[in-house]
Amino acid sequence: KDGLIQDAPGRGVLVAPLDVDWMRQVYQVRGALDALAAKLAAARRFQIDSGLIARGREAAQGKDVKAMIDADMAFHQAIYAAAQNPLIAQSAQLHWHHLRRVMGAVLQSTQQRNSIWDEHEAIAQAMAAGQAERAAALIDHHSQQASNKLGARLSEQLFSRKTSTGDTL
């Protein structure tokens, strides 16, 4: 099930509701994996494809949320590959379906789209310069910021849904 569906006795299964606390925990794991990957990639002075960042910035200017998510995933997956430790990518892959779902629910807001790619570019520069600790710190900050922003936006959306349907908290 991987947390995407839940049993609904007498009705089969339902799509599991989005959960802010679960999402924050997923981001904690992702942040740790990303920091390790960035350190290893920086040790190799990995230079990310500049076209990848350009495509991400372009997607951020549009309205296609799937393209935004795909660009973000491509950036992180490039770092996982550059780390040359297949366990990082395998471990991260377990969590990306949860992240895609949360990102898809909240990325309609344009406020943070450009800052995400500014952060990605700074991470890429640190890796290319061989600054492993800086790359890890930047990607950790990036993950924490993403968790905070997406968590706040998700909380707003969930609260809005509950109040519009008359549910109580």
Give the label of every model feature segment.
Residues V26, I48-G56, M68, D72, ...:
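Hydrophobic packing residues in well-ordered alpha-helices of helical domains and bundles
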Residues L52-E58, R101-L169:
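C-terminal all-alpha effector/ligand-binding and dimerization domain
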Residues D34-D70:
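Amphipathic alpha-helical dimerization/coiled-coil segments
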Residues Q28-A43, M73-Q112, A146-L150:
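Hydrophobic, amphipathic alpha-helical faces that serve as interaction scaffolds
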Residues K1-A43, G151-L169:
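Short linear motifs at protein or domain termini
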